[in-house]
Amino acid sequence: MGIRLYKAYTPGTRNRSISDFKELKNNKPEKSLTSSYHKKQGRNNRGIITIRHRGGGHKKLYRQIDFERNKFNIPGQVKSIEYDPNRNTRISLIHYEDGEKRYILAPRGLNIGDKIISSEEADITIGNTLPLTKIPLGTAIHNIEIKPGKGGQLVRSAGTVAQLIAKEGLVATIRLPSGEVRTIGKNCLATIGQLGNVDSNNRSFGKAGSKRWLGKKPTVRGVVMNPVDHPHGGGEGRAPIGRKRPLTPWGRPALGKKSRKNHKYSDAFIIRRRK
């Protein structure tokens, strides 16, 4: 897992760098675990844009990922490590002893041929899934459940890792990659290890087209818009925003104002807010 640098043959390759993909061993996904899906292009069910800057992108198949890791007490073997166009981490194809195949998120250090298992009595080794109550303090974990049986929802991005720092009563305390410290039920599942492709953030796209392949459209600055489109718009020539502070396109405070709503249900579980 490294970074491949381009020579400056063209303006687009001058600052371009991508993953070298050396860890990948299979170019074709498992057909039984893929499906097509309709891109929403950032629209809701009425066709209204609810998320800006989305649209286009290369055609992709969805890989069905096992976030639940609910195949208990049945060992599985890693058959391949594959690229997934829908996320920035790699995925591993697992063949279980009963014949079933599943994709999981590929942790750092998990290699082809390794054995994994989901069990309360599993060893503390990379790729194994256990309840938090069975994991020692200080262990690096990822793909963490918030509600038992719902599947992993936290720490699923490339290179991320959380740490189990305390267990008391019915809850466990974890430190998330953002720096937030929060409590989670001790019966929730988590997977051992740090997620792979840790150099994902070190890539440099180099040109606008690379982002368009990912389905990301340009972000236009509000100061170059018309007044009807943005609070920063208007003026003669290059004009300042004309406000005491920056605003969003909808007139809310931007750039530094905390957007988390007050009295959210999860406030009771957060010990220390993210940095």
Curated annotation (Swiss-Prot):
Belongs to the universal ribosomal protein uL2 family. Gene3D superfamilies: 2.30.30.30, Nucleic acid-binding proteins (2.40.50.140), Ribosomal protein L2, domain 3 (4.10.950.10). It comes from the Eukaryota. GO terms for cellular component: chloroplast; mitochondrial large ribosomal subunit. One of its GO terms (biological process) is mitochondrial translation. Pfam families: Ribosomal_L2, Ribosomal_L2_C. It is found in: Plastid, Chloroplast. This is Large ribosomal subunit protein uL2c. It comes from Chaetosphaeridium globosum. Its main location: plastid. The gene is rpl2. Coiled coil: none annotated.
